[in-house]
């Protein structure tokens, strides 16, 4: 059974983001908001890798590559959010999320699900942006109609 390019690279995004955040937590930098933004680098890597694999396989249709790029980033985002939910409950649930939200853009006391849903929307928005940027970067490699 062959794993799809999108799923494989989405899992790479998930693992790299997970290792990055665990490393930040272990080094005591989990509360530094600006370091959290660097996770977009891992999304760029996974999406770019998916497009490179598609181009190497001779898939040069712009739309199918855009869908592939978007699916790759969304798989990475969804897996990362699921990982965050599991990790948050392991670390104490709502109390853990409230300690995170002190350095994030929340007011009040968000629950694990509120925090995760807001990060899901942020992740979907960043997936669209990353997909557009990577597709623009590789634009000259695709067939013109």
Tell where the protein language model's regions lie, with residue ranges.
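Alpha-helical transmembrane segments of multi-pass membrane proteins, especially transporters
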Residues: 9, 13, 40, 64, ...
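Transmembrane alpha-helical insertion/packing segments
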Residues: 1-54
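Cytoplasmic juxtamembrane interface segments
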Residues: 44-71
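Cytoplasmic juxtamembrane regions at transmembrane-helix boundaries
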Residues: 136-145
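Hydrophobic alpha-helical membrane-insertion segments
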Residues: 69-87
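Functional transmembrane-helix hotspots
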Residues: 83-103
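Hydrophobic alpha-helical transmembrane segments
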Residues: 109-130
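Transmembrane alpha-helical segments of multi-pass membrane transport proteins and ion-pumping complexes
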Residues: 14-18, 44, 77, 81, ...
């Amino acid at each position: 059974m062959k794993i799809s390019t999108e799923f494989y690279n989405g899992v790479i995004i998930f693992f790299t983001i997970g290792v990055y955040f665990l490393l930040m937590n272990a080094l005591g930098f989990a509360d530094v908001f600006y370091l959290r933004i660097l996770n977009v680098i891992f999304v760029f890597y996974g999406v770019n890798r998916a497009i490179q694999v598609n181009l190497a396989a001779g898939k040069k249709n712009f739309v199918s590559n855009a869908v592939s790029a978007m699916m790759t980033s969304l798989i990475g985002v969804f897996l990362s959010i699921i990982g965050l939910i599991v990790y948050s409950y392991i670390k104490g649930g709502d109390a853990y999320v409230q300690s995170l939200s002190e350095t994030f853009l929340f007011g009040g006391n968000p629950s694990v699900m509120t925090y995760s849903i807001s990060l899901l929307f942020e992740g979907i928005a960043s997936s669209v942006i990353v997909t557009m940027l990577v597709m623009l970067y590789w634009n000259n490699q695709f067939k013109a109609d």
